[in-house]
């Protein structure tokens, strides 16, 4: 099948989670015999035409010039290019800046949308932006032929709010068979006797709620490791609040 992946800055991954997924999933699809195209920003560090068999389609991305607004133009450029290519499937990763162009999506391909998280609830966004993101979510939920939820909570939300079925597909991870257990000594924990939270240090990820629960459970003394980029305002807040 001829498959397109939209909604990321491109592959290989230099940016974040959706790019990481696009990199590995696109190559996997090629290995399964599909013809795969991934849209990249024109200024992506990788400027080759193919990546491990994946066709790379560079499109103009003025984010460097206009900030977030440039993402809407980039997504528009990707969609307009996709209209010319007779794809069988279009996989959109996220909906923030592409759902407003739903009426331009080519009609023939099956349109699959990974709905990401509840972006409109993120506290870092102003009220007008949150309202826009809520509308963007509604447009994506209504226009997608198939929806993908990366958590059971999102799947339940989509059904309750939009009466739309979705397929739950959790994020994957690399498995390794020979971990270096000596690393645990650096953190003063033992194999099989610790809990771990790995997340972005942002308020909406509720790390403080997790740690408050741990602090209140006086009977369970299992150590907990919190992993993430903690050199942030929220990270400083957590370290001060739970320093004991």
For every predicted segment, state its role.
Residues 154-174, 187-190:
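Helix-loop-beta element that forms the nucleotide-linked donor phosphate-binding surface
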Residues 80-83, 129-147, 156:
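Membrane-proximal helix-turn-helix segments that form the acceptor-binding/catalytic region
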């Amino acid at each position: 099948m001829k498959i397109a992946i939209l909604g990321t800055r491109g592959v290989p991954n230099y940016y974040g989670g959706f790019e990481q997924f696009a990199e590995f999933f696109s190559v996997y699809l090629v290995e399964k015999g599909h013809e795969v195209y991934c849209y990249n920003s024109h200024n992506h560090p990788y400027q080759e035409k193919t990546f491990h068999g994946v066709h790379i389609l560079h499109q103009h991305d003025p984010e460097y010039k206009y900030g977030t607004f440039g993402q809407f133009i980039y997504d528009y450029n990707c969609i307009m290019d996709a209209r010319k290519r007779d794809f069988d499937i279009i996989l959109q990763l996220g909906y923030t800046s592409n759902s407003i162009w739903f009426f331009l999506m080519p009609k023939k391909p099956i349109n699959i949308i990974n709905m990401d998280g509840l972006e409109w609830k993120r506290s870092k966004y102003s009220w007008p932006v949150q309202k826009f993101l809520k509308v963007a979510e509604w447009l994506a939920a209504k226009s997608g032929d198939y929806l993908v939820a990366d958590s059971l909570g999102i799947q339940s939300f989509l059904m309750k709010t939009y009466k739309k079925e979705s397929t739950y597909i959790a994020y994957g991870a690399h498995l390794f068979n020979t971990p270096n257990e000596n690393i645990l000594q650096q953190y003063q924990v033992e194999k099989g006797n610790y809990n771990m939270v790995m997340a972005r240090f942002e308020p909406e990820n509720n790390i403080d709620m997790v740690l408050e629960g741990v602090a209140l459970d006086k009977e369970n003394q299992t150590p907990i490791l919190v992993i993430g980029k903690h050199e942030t305002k929220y990270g400083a807040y957590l370290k001060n609040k739970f320093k004991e």
